[in-house]
């Protein structure tokens, strides 16, 4: 009996250890996320519930010029006792021709499972992006795995060109961030349907080694009638062995919440 209990406890400990290293990162374009949406209690409660399902959520399309929405939303996320923290970018659109499309990015992350160590907007000296990508470095607490997340919301009509320019961002990241060997690109790439064909994407350097596109071209990440793989995850090859899967989190059917669903990857221990 004692031996059986020891086996059970050992198995339980092994399962707990494996589970502790299973970790989920989401990307979520919360369409036109500003004070008007924050005033809709049911919508905000749905959004907060979604964030609490993941260890890190990269949010795009925060459109509030007063910069109040991201912080106000964090209070709702944590109202039930969660311990999320927020890191929010400055408004993007540094170049004069991009200012009419300026938005903020945000990372909401569970402080019990992950630490954010640094963050910065990409230094877009060549004006490759309408909204400069936002980059943050993280350390997973369960095993001290370090990685960098770069999130972007491309301009739809320039999607292919902006996705191509992520290769430049990949070269810039190690000049700005320490321990930047493992990189995760995520966000609303607009990488599908009329904005970016598979053939156009296949011609890009970011589509080839050392990069691995986790979310396939035939995915459906939006609430429109047409199935389009707008929202993507791309990881460097040295993270590929950690990726335990991906999915679309279809937690709502109303476009009042967003016109995109969250997309997420599971980042496990090295397999």
Predicted regions and their residues:
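Positively charged n-region of N-terminal signal peptides that target proteins for export
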Residues: 1-6
């Amino acid at each position: 009996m004692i031996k059986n209990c020891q086996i059970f406890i050992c198995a339980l400990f092994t399962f707990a250890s494996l589970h502790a290293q299973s970790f989920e990162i989401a990307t979520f374009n919360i369409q036109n996320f500003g004070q008007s949406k924050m005033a809709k209690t049911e919508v905000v409660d749905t959004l907060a519930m979604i964030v609490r399902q993941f260890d890190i959520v990269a949010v795009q399309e925060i459109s509030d010029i007063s910069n109040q929405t991201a912080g106000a939303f964090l209070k709702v996320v944590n109202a039930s006792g969660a311990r999320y923290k927020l890191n929010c970018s400055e408004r993007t659109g540094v170049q004069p021709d991009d200012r009419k499309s300026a938005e903020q990015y945000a990372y909401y992350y569970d402080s019990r499972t992950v630490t954010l160590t640094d963050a910065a907007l990409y230094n877009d000296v060549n004006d490759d992006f309408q909204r400069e990508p936002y980059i943050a470095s993280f350390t997973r607490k369960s095993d001290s795995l370090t990685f960098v997340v770069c999130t972007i919301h491309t301009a739809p009509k320039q999607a292919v060109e902006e996705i191509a320019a992520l290769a430049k961002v990949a070269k810039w990241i190690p000049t700005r961030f320490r321990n930047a060997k493992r990189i995760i690109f995520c966000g609303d790439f607009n990488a599908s349907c009329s904005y970016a064909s598979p053939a156009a994407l296949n011609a890009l350097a970011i589509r080839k080694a050392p990069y691995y596109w986790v979310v396939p071209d035939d995915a459906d990440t939006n609430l429109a009638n047409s199935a389009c793989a707008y929202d993507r995850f791309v990881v460097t090859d040295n993270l590929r062995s950690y990726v335990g899967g991906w999915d679309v989190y279809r937690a709502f059917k109303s476009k009042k919440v967003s016109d995109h669903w969250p997309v997420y990857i599971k980042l496990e221990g090295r397999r």
